[in-house]
């Protein structure tokens, strides 16, 4: 017992040497750990994100507009009062919803896959995106929408005006604003809860985001043309050079919806919503 710390008569020297050796080895391992190198400046990071946002927004809207135009041109039968038939409405909603799903899943690691000034605005208001990044993303989204509208107008039969968002019969301008507000609030809140708020379901966020737009456009295509995205309405209007007099509602409504979603997101975060229904992110076999 007397020799417990003496290491059999060596007065602890063996232990000291061993400890010293282990400490040296730990320092060696620490030095050999790969260091994360940064190749981009802050400005460079913003520019890369802006480039991804431009390409992603362009592809999302190009295929959305294309699907919209093809659906209308191929449908010989219209609904009452010259409105779109139900199967055409579903086709258009799927064109935008699935185009968003695919491109968000593709570009979220580059830019976040926002493709929408209202979503960008909502993320900034909720504290999930720096305003400086938004200043780079907004112009990318707007320019990409203009390019998509112009190319679709040039490459497809008919005109990009077929994809314009217009109010449905008996839908007033005031109703249009509030409808667009709620359609966009649905979309933005899904983005906040599935993508911005990290959980075990985050990897499926693109699916939820695409389906959220699809769900919003099922009624939206009939009553407002189905925007939920200012540049979705702006791009085809620029491409066809055909702006409805109430085009502004497709900016005001979605931005209000983004603010509504961001406000509720901040509220439930402040109230620690995780404690209201605990265990949702526990392993499924626990």
UniProtKB/Swiss-Prot annotation:
It is found in: Membrane. InterPro entries: Aquaporin-like, Aquaporin_transptr, MIP. It is a multi-pass membrane protein. Residues 1-52, 109-135, 197-202, 266-286 are cytoplasmic. The keyword rRNA-binding does not apply. GO terms for molecular function: water channel activity. Residues 1-34 are annotated as: Disordered. A motif (NPA 2) lies at residues 229-231. Keywords: Glycoprotein, Membrane, Repeat, Transmembrane, Transmembrane helix, Transport. Probable water channel that may have redundant functions with FgAQP5. Aquaporins contain two tandem repeats each containing three membrane-spanning domains and a pore-forming loop with the signature motif Asn-Pro-Ala (NPA). FgAQP3 has NPA/NPV motifs which is in accordance with the fungal aquaporins (NPx and NxA). This is Probable aquaporin-3.
